[in-house]
Design a protein with these regions (language model features):
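PLP-dependent class I/II
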Residues: 1-201
Length: 201
């Protein structure tokens, strides 16, 4: 439930921990790095009413001993973030989301739904293989000395073949940088040798 502050539907956040009848099957995981935009801080929480899961997790915790000290210090300081921090970050993500989604959907052959939460989207591209495309962008493509880095969406699915023409893109950059990335992405799609026609999607 690490994205609970970033729900864009206007609906209230309801924790899975409050759903009746599934108590023994519910595991809540929280992360300081997601909630407070502190990339790399490996501090969080795992909460469950299932004693068997708690016992198994405790073994991993005892083997690890403790998270890095700096991460703990940063995490503790983050807990004191004022409420306006969340409002400001939320408002900024709403603007960045609009910038990225509108820009993606203007590129021929690209489609991105409007995410209802978090700070990333999964966009469908007119390409043969997202793993190949993402690697090609990093290793073989540049436009005016720049390229784009995306995550192949296939790694986020368990169904074989799912996400083969999708990429995950975060809108954590400033809007000017997102707009520039959209220009570079459009140029990459024009040049990519594995581009496919829309009907092949």
């Amino acid at each position: 439930e690490v994205y609970r502050e970033y729900i864009y539907t206007g609906s209230p956040y309801i924790s899975a921990m409050h759903l009746e009848g599934i108590e023994q099957n519910t595991v809540l995981i929280d992360s300081v790095s997601k909630r407070y935009s502190e990339c790399g801080i490996r501090v969080g929480a795992l909460i469950t009413k299932n004693a068997e899961i708690r016992k198994a997790v405790m073994k991993f915790c005892q083997a690890r001993l403790s998270p890095p000290l700096i991460g703990q210090i940063v995490a503790e300081a983050s807990l004191d973030a004022p409420e306006e921090y969340y409002r400001d970050v939320y408002d900024e993500y709403v603007e960045r989301r609009k910038c990225l989604i509108d820009g993606l959907n203007r590129i021929p052959g690209v489609y991105s739904p409007i995410p209802m939460g978090a700070f990333y989207t999964v966009a469908k591209l007119p390409i043969d293989d997202s793993d190949k495309f993402c690697r090609w962008c990093l290793e073989e493509f540049e436009y005016e000395g720049e390229t784009v880095m995306m995550a192949p969406a296939s790694g986020f699915y368990t169904t074989p073949g799912a996400g083969r023409n999708q990429v995950r893109m975060a809108y954590v950059l400033k809007k000017d940088d997102l707009n520039r990335a959209l220009i570079v992405l459009a140029k990459a799609l024009e040049a990519y040798p594995g581009r496919v026609e829309d009907e092949g999607l």
